[in-house]
Each structure stands twice: as structure tokens, then as C-alpha cells.
Design a protein with these regions (language model features):
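Residue-level signal for secondary-structure boundary elements
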Residues: 15-18, 22, 41-44, 81, ...
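Long amphipathic alpha-helical coiled-coil segments
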Residues: 128-133, 141, 183-186, 219-224
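Start-of-helix signal in alpha-solenoid helical-repeat scaffolds, especially tetratricopeptide repeats
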Residues: 117-119, 124, 182-184, 189, ...
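Residue position in alpha-helical solenoids
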Residues: 65, 72, 129, 168, ...
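Intrinsically disordered, low-complexity regulatory regions with latent secondary structure
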Residues: 4-12, 92, 108, 143, ...
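Central/C-terminal regulatory/activation regions of fungal transcription factors
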Residues: 1-140, 148-163
Length: 242
């Protein structure tokens, strides 16, 4: 879906109709997923600058989903004449603010469930993109200053991705503790990327595998869903596709 279409959809979303808000979210989410898939699959043939531009576009689409969800919740509150109730942690800017919205248990549960599924899917897509970027850097230029500089850029990108996820998490997750958990989870990425690079340079594959599996075990112990971690680790061992 083109950016202009996204903007047109946002502009036509009624502020006082939560049903239209639900429809808009249903339109945005599939396009967002497609954008993530394209970004991940094309990572190996994309320059760092182009990838950064793609991330900015992705961030805008995440914002569109958040705006649509905001409209839906505000419409629900307006149509049902609700002015107080369940306090949800919500953010449309870098600084969060509180909004009191009363939701039925069914709607509240469904919203959190869908949000958690999307967050898990997106997190692992980005994890795969980060690890693949590190691999392609090594294959392209395993020696020299240029390789070191590019690996440094990869680690910086990991922090950028962490910031992107943390900001976007507040759109989808109505639980501050979950957002904090995502933040802590993302802090592991720079370590993983750096360790993967040093492990490949020094052929320490056993230590690399052990470190990644230990991290995954700690994440599982913390309750974070890492169903795709084995697939991600497999990609790390295999290197770039043919």
C-alpha cells in the first residue's frame, strides 16, 4: 500500500466511530506485516542508508496503526459516553500520557492478545534482520577497517531498532511492565551482534552457540515468547543464503 493511500485512510477515519476504527486497523495491520516481510527479505541487498529510510517508513506505518487504534478507543469511549474506567498506558509521542478508557473484558482481552501476537512476530523479524546484517558484513569484507566500521554501524542500528520497538510498543500493549520487558529484551541485541562478529572472526562457534542459547533460556525464564529463536539461531550458523 502506497504512503499516500495510508494518509488518505487516516484522514478519513472518523473520530467518533470505533467500528470504522476497527476497520482501519484491519487495513493497516496486513500492510504493516507485508512491509516488515519486504524489509527483512531484502536486507542483504540494501545499503545501510536505504535500510534507515525503510525503517523511517516502517515507523510511520506503526504510527498509523497506533493512530487508528487511538481513534477506535476514543470512538468507543464517545459512543458509550464513558469518561472514566480502566486506565491504559498509552503514548503517541516520546513522552507517554495516561488515558482513562473503559473497555469490556472481551474487547480488552482481544486487543492485548492481537497486540502481543504482532509484537512477537515483529520482534523476531527484526532480530533476524539484525543477525543477517552482521553475517553479510562479514562475508562482504571479513578483514580491514571498513569491516570494523560497518560492524559498528550494525550495533548502532540495533540500538535504533530497540528505540523503534520501544516507542511502538506503547501503541499496542496496554501494560507498562510488558513494554519494560521488551526494552530489556532489546538491550541484548548489541551484545548478540557483537559476539556473533567476534565469534566468526575467531572461529568460536561453540561459544557463540552457547551464549545465544543461554540468552534464549533466560528470556524463556522471563516469560518472553521466543518460539522462532531456533530458526534465528539456524540463520546465524548457516550464514547468508545462496
Amino acid at each position: 500500500m502506497a504512503s499516500a493511500e495510508w494518509l488518505n485512510l487516516l484522514e478519513t477515519c472518523p473520530q467518533n466511530s470505533y467500528l470504522d476504527g476497527i476497520w482501519l486497523i484491519a487495513v493497516h495491520i496486513p500492510a504493516l506485516m507485508q512491509n516488515i516481510d519486504t524489509l527483512t527479505l531484502n536486507r542483504h541487498s540494501t545499503t545501510t542508508a536505504a535500510f534507515t529510510v525503510a525503517l523511517v517508513s516502517l515507523d510511520a506505518r506503526v504510527g498509523a496503526v497506533g493512530t487508528a487504534l487511538d481513534n477506535w478507543l476514543e470512538g468507543y469511549q464517545h459512543e458509550h459516553n464513558i469518561s472514566d474506567g480502566l486506565g491504559l498506558y498509552w503514548s503517541s509521542t516520546a513522552l507517554p500520557h495516561s488515558t482513562n478508557i473503559a473497555l469490556s473484558p472481551t474487547i480488552d482481552f482481544a486487543t492485548k492478545t492481537v497486540a502481543s501476537m504482532m509484537m512477537t512476530y515483529w520482534t523476531h523479524k527484526l532480530e533476524l534482520a539484525i543477525l543477517r546484517e552482521d553475517i553479510y558484513v562479514l562475508e562482504a569484507n571479513p578483514e580491514g577497517t571498513d569491516a570494523n566500521d560497518r560492524v559498528g554501524a550494525v550495533i548502532a542500528n540495533a540500538y535504533d531498532l530497540a528505540s523503534l520497538i520501544i516507542r511502538s510498543a506503547t501503541y499496542w500493549l496496554a501494560n507498562e511492565n510488558v513494554s519494560i520487558h521488551v526494552c530489556m529484551y532489546m538491550l541484548i541485541y548489541p551484545y548478540r551482534v557483537a559476539w556473533a562478529w567476534f565469534a566468526r572472526r575467531s572461529k568460536l562457534y561453540a561459544e557463540e552457540i552457547s551464549a545465544c542459547r543461554n540468552i534464549r533460556a533466560r528470556l524463556l525464564a522471563g516469560g518472553f515468547n521466543t518460539r522462532l529463536s531456533e530458526f534465528v539461531l539456524d540463520q546465524l550458523y548457516k550464514g547468508p543464503p545462496e
